[in-house]
A protein has these predicted regions:
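Acidic (Asp/Glu-rich), glycine- and aromatic
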Residues: 127-158
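Asparagine-centered strand-capping/turn motif at beta-strand->loop junctions
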Residues: 14, 126-132, 241
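Glycine-rich active-site loops that engage anionic ligands at enzyme catalytic sites
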Residues: 220-263
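Acidic-aromatic substrate-binding/catalytic surfaces of carbohydrate-active enzymes
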Residues: 8-66
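Short Pro-Gly-centered flexible turn/kink motifs
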Residues: 14, 60-68, 275-292
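Active-site/ligand-binding surface loops and adjacent short beta/alpha elements
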Residues: 148-232
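Extended, loop-rich substrate-binding clefts of extracytoplasmic carbohydrate-active enzymes
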Residues: 70-119
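Short, structured beta-strand/loop micro-motifs enriched in basic residues and often containing a Trp
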Residues: 44-50, 262-270
Length: 293
């Protein structure tokens, strides 16, 4: 099932499967989100919950039981309940059933996804609450994919990622099969822009920590057209694209948690998390994106 809202600048469609934004068009009817070509990458803008990245050995343990889990959690792969689709807002909710708790994640939670259009801005708020009787630990992040080039008259080299100030981001190394190795390095020093090339992501994503910038966007250099994410307050921001040449899309991914590391314990309660909610607790985060095109 899908729901659509629009204003004078943007039209947004969200699918209840994964609570995923599957289309975002500007006033000219141009598609801004990647359209999930399965030959390249089959998703549009998945929600990452209740973990980000990979689990060590593809599993975790809790209460003496082992739970198998794929990359980026399971919220992106299950049906969410549509609560509201009117005016400028779409809102959905995910609550675990007994099968989900038995097979995937043995905790009670409520994950609410709220999409709101505001002029040329899309605000996507994820709220997690704990209705259960025990602590809820979780990871969470965003993974929107934006089509590039913006039109047929431009090529990949006409684009760059741009911070709002010069940056020397610390890159967390995940060369251990997608797991953090505990090493870090500098790929760029005192740079405000990162040139997009067809080989930029040959070694997968860049997970950046310690950013001071408020925004990170993808810019068309000759026109100034852009898609800009407000990444302030997120401890980690990734950039990524699939191994397709030429590059067909780029992802700007603000995360509140990290993948597992090569030496992580298997016990869920010993894993680093975005938040640890006591019974009755609530936590939220918002990604705001401005579409200047």
């Amino acid at each position: 099932m899908q729901a659509t809202i629009q204003n004078e600048f943007l039209s947004l469609t969200v699918d209840t499967h994964g609570a995923e934004a599957v289309s975002l068009k500007n006033a000219a009817g141009e598609e801004l989100l990647w359209q999930a070509d399965p030959a390249v990458w089959k998703r549009h803008a998945p929600i990452l919950f209740p973990w980000t990245g990979k689990l060590k050995d593809g599993s975790f343990t809790y209460g003496g039981k082992t739970y198998k889990g794929g990359q980026h959690g399971f919220a992106r792969d299950v049906e969410h309940t549509l609560l509201k689709a009117e005016g400028d807002t779409i809102q959905l909710e995910l609550r675990p059933d007994e099968a989900m708790k038995a097979e995937k994640f043995p905790f009670d939670f409520v994950l609410t996804s709220t999409f709101r259009l505001d002029g040329k801005n899309l605000h996507h708020t994820l709220t997690v609450s704990n209705p259960g009787a025990e602590e809820l630990r979780f990871g969470i992040g965003y993974h929107p994919a934006f089509q590039v080039p913006f039109d047929n008259s431009h090529t990949v080299e006409d684009y760059e990622f741009r911070f709002d100030q010069p940056e020397s981001p610390v890159i967390l190394d995940a060369s251990g099969g997608g797991l953090l190795t505990g090493k870090c390095y500098y790929q760029w020093k005192n740079q405000q822009a990162i040139q997009l090339t067809n080989d930029l992501f040959d070694n997968d994503s860049f997970c950046m920590a310690g950013l001071r910038t408020r925004t990170l966007g993808i810019y068309e250099k000759d026109t100034g057209r852009s898609i800009v994410c407000d990444v302030a307050g997120f401890p980690y921001t990734l950039i990524w694209s699939a191994l397709s040449k030429p590059v067909r899309f780029v992802c700007i991914e603000p995360w509140n948690s990290l993948p597992a590391s090569v030496d992580d314990p298997q016990e869920w309660e010993q894993r680093a998390a975005a938040a640890c909610l006591a019974p009755g607790g609530e936590w939220s985060t918002t990604l705001s994106t401005t579409f200047n095109r």
